[in-house]
Swiss-Prot record:
Domain LRRCT residues, every copy: 242-288
UniProt family annotation: Belongs to the LRFN family.
Extracellular topological domain: 21-534
Name this protein carries in UniProt: Leucine-rich repeat and fibronectin type-III domain-containing protein 2
UniProt entry tagged with the keyword rRNA-binding: no
Composition-biased stretches (Pro residues): 642-651
Amino acid sequence: METLLGGLLAFGMAFAVVDACPKYCVCQNLSESLGTLCPSKGLLFVPPDIDRRTVELRLGGNFIIHIGRQDFANMTGLVDLTLSRNTISHIQPFSFLDLESLRSLHLDSNRLPSLGEDTLRGLVNLQHLIVNNNQLGGIADDAFEDFLLTLEDLDLSYNNLHGLPWDSVRRMVNLHQLSLDHNLLDHIAEGTFADLQKLARLDLTSNRLQKLPPDPIFARSQASLLTATPFAPPLSFSFGGNPLHCNCELLWLRRLERDDDLKTCGSPGGLKGRYFWHIREEEFVCEPPLITQHTHKLLVLEGQAATLKCKAIGDPSPLIHWVAPDDRLVGNSSRTAVYDNGTLDILITTSQDSGPFTCIAANAAGEATATVEVSIVQLPHLSNSTSRMAPPKSRLSDITGSSKTSRGGGGSGAGEPPKSTPERAVLVSDVTTTSALVKWSVSKSAPRVKMYQLQYNCSDDEVLIYRMIPASNKAFVVNNLVSGTGYDLCVLAMWDDTATTLTATNIVGCAQFFTKADYPQCQSMHSQILGGTMILVIGGIIVATLLVFIVILMVRYKVCNHDAPGKMAAATVSNVYSQTNGAQPPPLGGMPVGQLPQAPPKVVVRNELMDFSTSLARACDSSSSSSLGSGEAAGLSRGPWRLPPPAPRPKPSLDRLMGAFASLDLKSQRKEELLDSRTPAGRGAGTSARGHHSDREPLLGPPATRARSLLPLPLEGKAKRSHSFDMGDFAAAAAAAPGGYSPPRRVSNIWTKRSLSVNGMLLPFEENDLVGARGTFGSSEWVMESTV
């Protein structure tokens, strides 16, 4: 019966346990321990119905993303927790706070970016921490704080770690295995492994380490099994795949006996790619430091910042230290800052900083030094021997206070000064809106002055402005002042006080002045208005000039159009040509024979006569009448008058050419008549001369330059002549040709006789011009037929 009751009780307990097991999980009750196995079940989160008495929990191979505080709450008996091969990217702080019995935590093959200081809080008995194959880029300094003394196995391989909390690693005295391979580590702090006496395996493969700090722990890698103890086991050390810089700093590692030959050097250039254990010890050398650049001298006003630079090269890279003038090593403090590149910043300088600063560059091969001379220009202060000479209530650091107490004292820098006060030695002159000339004088009995200091400020504020002036100057121009403002100014003399070994200062004098008022805005507005007025005036002048020019052109155009019909009428009246073949011309308009129509009392336009006279010579040698137009244009351009161009005329013809001949012939006859009327002898000579060359003159004509002698004559009381043109053989030949047609001939071959009608225009030629025209054609070619 008792046996039956015991079996039923055991079955009931097993049924209760199975009933509490999460879905898709397997729960095992092994004696006193309870295991919950949920590997690769496709879980997206930690099942909430897990028995809190679980000792072993396996959740690997799922898709869990987040770990919260309630996921493992009250699991105080949990010893082994496996969260491998999930997609965990975030662990809420204090999520493992209740897992005080946990011995092993597997977080490998997840997506954790970092480990915060509270991520692993509460794991006080943790011995195995596996966090490999994640995306860890950083680990907080206190992340391992709760299990530093209990941790035995730490695996951080295959991450993106650039550094580790080396101080925490140094305190893991029970650590047996440390896997840091396949990371981005480039530095290991010296002395990190000094206390890790139980370390049996150290893996630093495939990092960026260029050197390893010498440590006695690495000597255990050569210890045999006979000499090994449980407290000092032999060390398995791997550091292949690192770009080792093979210099004197790795000589200690080269002297170790190793069995593998796979390590190679990454630098320097002469040893790059060579097997580490095959390189001779003599080739592991270093270069002493060399300072390449540093500050030589520096002048700083007391209280201001100073920057001292020092750069050095060497192999390995040297460390730079600074030594103050009092042989004190300068470090980082509230007043100074030392940087890794060798720069020293003094944030606030004092008089004690004056002197030589020493830059020391040191490495494993030696050291180099350089000196920087720092000079501090001290702020003015009174020494004990000169304090009684200062005016009452005058303070060197507050000129405004000293000057405001004496506003009614005539502009002095203090109250009622004694008779020998130095304020009178300062004069301010040539005051403008933005500048003033300050002059001062010092008595010959004064100590040797090193420098003068000019202090001034505006009466509207309390900001002092300092100007350092060499001792050789006794005047200074103060610029960049504000217009219409009062200023308080003092001049101080600085010299070395042998009693206090400090720079003593005494007031030479003080003064007050006001700058002149200025109105830049009004002047600017006036200049703008003046500039705009000038632009308007110039534009108006240009527009008026253009309008006047346009009006002149329009008036001239109208005058030309008005005169053109009159010119054409004059040309029509004065150029009446007819070809009669030697016969008498018929009556004009029914008028009696021998009587010509009276032309209107006009003077023929002068430019038309010029056209005929200047183109005459060219027309005689041309075979076409088109050359006459070009001769007219040339004669007009060479004339002495620039008359408006005549109205368009019809194309020149043979009749117009004959009119030119007649004009020249009538001119010569007119001249002969004038000569005959003066002297009897002249009449006979004129008659003979007229019969000799009057017919040849029109053909030759005077040169075109004689066209300026043309003058209009009145039409009344002048004889009118008519000449007939006889074609001679030309007409007979034309009639004899069959069909009344004859081959064309040159016009020059038929100019034998002509008939011209000219009214009132004579060409006054000189006698010598007529003589020059003789001999070209015979007088037989020209026959005067009739004269009316």
